[in-house]
Amino acid sequence: NVNKKAGKAIKQNLMRILFGRLHYNAESAGIGWVTVQRNEEKIKEVLTAAHTNDATVPDLQNHISNDVFIQIVNSVIRLIGNAYRYEGNPYDDEIFPRDTDAEFRNLKSKDPIRLYIYACCDKFGIPYERRNGRQTKMPNVLGQAVLDYLKAVGNKQMFLKPHTLKVRCVSLEEKGLICPNCGRVHLNLSAGICSGCFRRLDDNHTIQVEKLRSNTDLMINVVKGRPVCRLHSEELSGQTDNQGERQLEFRDIVRIKSQDSN
């Protein structure tokens, strides 16, 4: 029980840093971007699967490269994280994986992931059908390929498992793209589409990673070159008769059953 409680708190804090709002996330702070294992065989499989099963469906390999596909996957990961769809999220009684989440068609018409995928399809000339209305469930070959790839690397039902994620860190000399419309920072190229407002990104609006890091307190110790320091904490809990037991139970690191004489 203690391990579960401590593990959940660690995951929550880690994911909060990776997918936080405004300047408090990995990309906006100049740390890097969240990605998953790259498997070329799996990429080819998901890009061609729909066309192989139905020749009338577009062959995605004729429209996007593997590099662009991974950029799209990375941005969808960011959007999933922004929606708290990850293991150990603070709203796990409301946000959890469902069987219907495995299908792109079940996304709401205004879901950010759906809108981002549509913008990518428009840019790369991938045909798709789009309708308005809450009752209309529209599939999308690119969107489904992204979800299928995430499932293949351990993140099924559009729900992230922290142990499957990787962070591609950036150096001070690298640059990020800034959306000219909403100002969102992208260290991942995002296939040239903003994952915030779904407008086009361009090379005329960039920012140095060094400047990003100086603008947020998440990286203040790195920017100032401060050495690693030891964290010291004091007990602030109330006093009890049994000092030894109290010390062991402090911060729930070890739990002692009151009836256990040992």
Which functions belong to the PLM regions below?
Residues 1-259:
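Helicase motor interdomain insertion/brace
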